[in-house]
Structures are given as structure tokens and as C-alpha cells.
């Protein structure tokens, strides 16, 4: 991704800027590069995420692959990582990484995060830990990680859990792991599910509008331990 200095718009360049650095890694790892999508991360949908899952599992079966690194825009990085964590059947190291600064910005972190991700993906200890997210020297589980700031390079955090490992100059260090990890086999993503966030004073206006839409389900991020403002209840009861 590159930032237009006049407008501030960030958009994909003609090609992935990381590709020109691939030869520098040949002495350590043998990289197979596949440019699956070339689009901003807000354009990602579950359909593209499912395509990624299919490609990963197929490549692992067909080729002698020991690890996978996915470069991804940070806006929906956690969503893609979590989707893959739930659906990829392969147990080899799978790492999702990105950059908080565009490739033409001062202090761009994309290359460093990419190299860190390659180190983790080529580490045998990273296997069977589910999908991992690697940025800013930290290794997070896709199950717990979330983006906490719009621009800070330390934006990806795992609240209450913290990172499960670190990338250091000496190598990759894991200090704990998930106790439980499970995956699901899916062949298509076709259901239309609406997500709503509850707020103080919320009424049933949005819920009433959804009643007339072709949706298959509603997920409500409620208050407290599942509480909702009383004025939302009439539509829910219907």
C-alpha cells in the first residue's frame, strides 16, 4: 500500500512492494510467492477469506510446504486471521502480517513485519498453534488478537491474554500457547448475518427495519452480561 501525499488516500501500488526483497531471503528460506488478491483490506469479504483457506489447504497437500505467510491490510486483518484459524485444516505454521505505515512513509514497518513473519512461519515450534498474527515483534493468536488503534504500530493486542511469543534478534521465542483449538469444515459462505452494537438508550428502530430485510440471523453485541435496553425488546419478541 502507498499513501498519496496530497490527498492522504492509501491504495495498492501496481505490485506488492515486498516482492523486490524476496531474493534477500533465499539463503535462509525457499519462498514460493503467490499473489492471490491485490486489493485494500476493507474490500475483503468472507468469500475471499474462504478462497484463501481453500488455497492454503490445497497447497499444503500438493507441495512440500513447511509454513505460510499472508500479507494483509490491517483494517480487516484480525477478521481474516480468525476466519482462517477456524477453517484451515493444515497444522503447519500459518502467519498473517501487515503494516501500519505505508511503504512510501518514513519508518515503514511492512518489510520488518514481513521478515518477522517469515521467521515465525519457518519455526517448527509455531506449528499446531492455530493461525498466528505477527507484527511489531509480537506473536499473537488469531483467537484473541484485535486492532486497538488506528495508526499506532503496536496496535495489535490480545486483551487479557497478551502475545504468546516474541521475535528477537536471536530467534523466535514462545512463552505460552492456547489450551484448546478447533476448526470447522465449510464449503461456502452464503448466509447474510447482521451485526448490531447495543448502546444506552437504544430503541427498536434498527431491529424493526431489519425485520423486512432478507437476513438469516442477527448478532447483537449487548451490554454487560447480555443486557439490552428495554425499548429493543418489542422487535426481538416478534
What are these regions (language model features)?
Residues 15-25, 141-225:
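Accessory alpha-helical/coil subdomains and C-terminal extensions
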Residues 2-14, 76, 82-95, 110-116, ...:
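A glycine- and small-aliphatic-rich helix-loop capping segment at beta-alpha/alpha-beta transitions
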Residues 1-59, 234:
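ATP/NTP phosphate-donor binding region
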Residues 96-168:
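Internal gly/pro-rich beta-alpha loop/helix module
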Residues 70-92, 228-237:
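Short Gly/Thr/Asp-enriched flexible loops that form oxyanion-binding sites at enzyme active sites
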Residues 70-72, 95-98, 132-136, 197, ...:
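Short beta-strand segments
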Residues 51, 110-113, 231-237:
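Charged helix-capping and loop-helix junction motifs
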Residues 62-77, 213-226:
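Short acidic, glycine-rich surface-loop motifs adjacent to enzyme active sites
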Amino acid at each position: 500500500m502507498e499513501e498519496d501525499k496530497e490527498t492522504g488516500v492509501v491504495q495498492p501500488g501496481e505490485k506488492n512492494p515486498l516482492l523486490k526483497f524476496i531474493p534477500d531471503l533465499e539463503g535462509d528460506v525457499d519462498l514460493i510467492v503467490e499473489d492471490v488478491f491485490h486489493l485494500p483490506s476493507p474490500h475483503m469479504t468472507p468469500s475471499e477469506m474462504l478462497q484463501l483457506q481453500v488455497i492454503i489447504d490445497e497447497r499444503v497437500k500438493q507441495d512440500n510446504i513447511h509454513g505460510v505467510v499472508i500479507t494483509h491490510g490491517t483494517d480487516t486483518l484480525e477478521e481474516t486471521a480468525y476466519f482462517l484459524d477456524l477453517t484451515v485444516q493444515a497444522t503447519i505454521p500459518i502467519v498473517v502480517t501487515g503494516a501500519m505505515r505505508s511503504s512510501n512513509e518514513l519508518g515503514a514497518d511492512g518489510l520488518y513485519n514481513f521478515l518477522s513473519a517469515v521467521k515465525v512461519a519457518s519455526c517448527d515450534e509455531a506449528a499446531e498453534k492455530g493461525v498466528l498474527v505477527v507484527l511489531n515483534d509480537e506473536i499473537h493468536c488469531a483467537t484473541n488478537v484485535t486492532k486497538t488503534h488506528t495508526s499506532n504500530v503496536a496496535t495489535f493486542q490480545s486483551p487479557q491474554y497478551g502475545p504468546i511469543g516474541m521475535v528477537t534478534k536471536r530467534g523466535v521465542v514462545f512463552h505460552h500457547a492456547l489450551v484448546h483449538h478447533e476448526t470447522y469444515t465449510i464449503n461456502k459462505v452464503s448466509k447474510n448475518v447482521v451485526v448490531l452494537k447495543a448502546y444506552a438508550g437504544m430503541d427498536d428502530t434498527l431491529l424493526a427495519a431489519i425485520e423486512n430485510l432478507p437476513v438469516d440471523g442477527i448478532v447483537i453485541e449487548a451490554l454487560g452480561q447480555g443486557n439490552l435496553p428495554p425499548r429493543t425488546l418489542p422487535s426481538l419478541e416478534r
